[in-house]
């Protein structure tokens, strides 16, 4: 007997503010929680204006440090995702899966591992050998290429992953990314020694997601 695959819809939001993306996520989450709604599982794809965000594990961030980061021209936002401080900005492909894990597997640990495997598989499609480490995320050697921080309530996921494509990496010089001392950051462009914009990464990411999560996927943009 064949098993029906979960259906996922990918939506490209373009470049939007972090706060706008949070509102869109909350709308999708609420629709999932509304028993009368039949909203599909969704991947929200976007880039952000420069913003530093901190997660639930972050100790109270010193006001002086917050002001220092804002003075650089970035926004600053506290979130309910897992993890510590990171940066989002132009040239970084951000993917927010709003999924009902009941359609997949009701395990947050499984879900995070599948996100990591998705990005590793996507990197492989570019010819980049990536891996996991004891620290959440995806790495190329000792350099993080993709940060992962999620939230899950009543098995509905939000937040997600941030893949460095052709990001201005100097933004990371102002923080200790994800609170991990002694490690660096990298991007698809750095690893391939050519410009790789987010739009080039989207088809490979969606292909890898479809394979890893064993789902059907529709996309409102061109995959060519």
Curated annotation (Swiss-Prot):
CDD domains recorded? LipB
Instruction: List residue numbers at the site (Lowers pKa of active site Cys).
Output: 144
Query: Which residues are the active-site ones?
Result: 178 (acyl-thioester intermediate)
Offer one example of a GO biological process linked to this entry: protein lipoylation
Give the protein's function: Catalyzes the transfer of endogenously produced octanoic acid from octanoyl-acyl-carrier-protein (octanoyl-ACP) onto the lipoyl domains of lipoate-dependent enzymes such as the protein H of the glycine cleavage system (GCSH). Lipoyl-ACP can also act as a substrate although octanoyl-ACP is likely to be the physiological substrate.
Q: What's the catalysed reaction?
A: octanoyl-[ACP] + L-lysyl-[protein] = N(6)-octanoyl-L-lysyl-[protein] + holo-[ACP] + H(+)
Family affiliation: Belongs to the LipB family.
Q: Where does substrate bind?
A: 81-88, 147-149, 160-162
Q: Which UniProt keywords apply?
A: Acyltransferase, Ligase, Mitochondrion, Transferase, Transit peptide
Q: What is this protein called?
A: Octanoyl-[acyl-carrier-protein]:protein N-octanoyltransferase LIPT2, mitochondrial
- Pfam hit, one: LplA-B_cat
**Sorted alphabetically, which InterPro entries does this protein's record hold?**
aa-tRNA-synth_II/BPL/LPL (IPR045864), BPL_LPL_catalytic (IPR004143), Octanoyltransferase (IPR000544), Octanoyltransferase_CS (IPR020605)
NCBIfam families attached to this UniProt entry: lipB (TIGR00214), PRK14345.1 (NF010925)
Which pathway does the database say it acts in? Answer: Protein modification; protein lipoylation via endogenous pathway; protein N(6)-(lipoyl)lysine from octanoyl-[acyl-carrier-protein]: step 1/2
Compartments where located: Mitochondrion
Q: Which PROSITE patterns match?
A: BPL_LPL_CATALYTIC, LIPB
Q: Its principal location?
A: mitochondrion
